[in-house]
Amino acid sequence: MKNNYVVLFCAFFISFLGNAQNFKSSKKIVDKTTKLPLENVAIYNDKDNSTTNQEGFFVFISEKNEINFNLLGYNSLKTTFEALEKQDTIFMEAKAFELKEVVITNVEPFIKKVYNKMEENYSSNYTSNFFLRNVLKKDNSIVVLQDIHAKRAKNTNPKNPDEIQVLNMRKTSFFEKKDQIDFRFPDLNEFFRGLFPALDKNIFTEEDYNDLDFRKILFESKEKNVEGQIFKGYFVINRNDYAVVEFFTTMRDNPEVVPYKKITFSSVQYRTTKYERLMKFSKNSTLNKYYLQLSKLMANVEVVPGTKSGSSFYFNLAMDYFTTSSFTNEKVEPNFATDKDVFKAKFPYSAEFWNNQNQLPLTTELKDFLKRVSENKDKKKEFEIIGNF
């Protein structure tokens, strides 16, 4: 009976049942040469969007019989759902790396033009649906899994730049009761906040890139911050319209010197040893404007318990976001504050809803986590399990 429960538990979460009026494809994408899985591949047509998980798997559902695959540094593919039916794996070929003659140039004028054209290049008012997955680990074990499907209305109001309507949610957490430390997820204000470097406080250099249509610009802050860290990262910029299509930053270059902080009214200490952001932007062909297509936040927090017997451990957070549809004019009815801890959201779960949504497939590690939750669901003395399905 327990085994049946595990199978059903995972099946409801994966939601692989299709909708007769939609086309659907669930495949794996790998590098043609190395055969390694490709993460963050953009899968789309002019109506719907999806992406690949860490293992290269994706689910794409659309009313339109067209699929495009795009990843910077690789040749794009265009096909149909029918053409993919007999393929289990999709192979993407990396573009040939053409090493340019080394020329020392001043990239600051180019970067200034990129910044000056941001208002022109990016849409500041639009509505789109999105998928957000939050995974929290304690050391190497998953303790929280949350998937959210919602509408986001982005606008120019500086006091309230984003309005969120959660359409459905599924979550579960699995903690040992001896763990008394509560981890707070970032709110959506922090998640959507831009972190572009100030022009006058950073050094910009160019690095060779294997696509002649783009330039890769590295940046690094001139001075360390109060925690002794250098802010660094890179841009990938379209040469034709000066739009940033990919942005990565890390705020921890020397985590060992980051000072500890204390939790109020406690002897527990903690410090953030990793904080990285990845953002990818796509162009809407109708509006001729770019929008946030994919975003990732990766953070590690070291915790030192106050008790002598307790050993230090790490919380590792991964937040994965991608838009699931093109722009719409649908009105958003906000039902979740953007300054609230994301995991504190309370909404019902509907298996039927998730059957027809573009979403990240579960990785093997996540499936194992759900199996562990189901196998220990009755051990209420040892474990605290919170979930909505």
Question: Can you describe what each PLM-predicted range is?
Answer:
Residues 91-215, 260, 268-389:
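Surface-exposed, low-complexity/disordered segments
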Residues 68-79:
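A short, solvent-exposed loop/turn motif at the edges and junctions
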Residues 23-25, 33-46:
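Short, ordered, surface-exposed loop/turn motifs in non-cytosolic proteins
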Residues 59-66:
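Short Pro-Gly-centered beta-turn/loop motif in secreted/extracellular proteins
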Residues 1-28, 389:
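Bacterial Sec-dependent N-terminal signal peptides
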Residues 48-57:
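Short, acidic Ser/Thr/Gly-rich low-complexity loop/linker segments typical of extracellular
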Residues 193-250:
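Extended beta-strand-rich segments in extracellular/periplasmic secretory proteins, especially
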Residues 25-32, 56, 90:
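A short, amphipathic beta-strand motif
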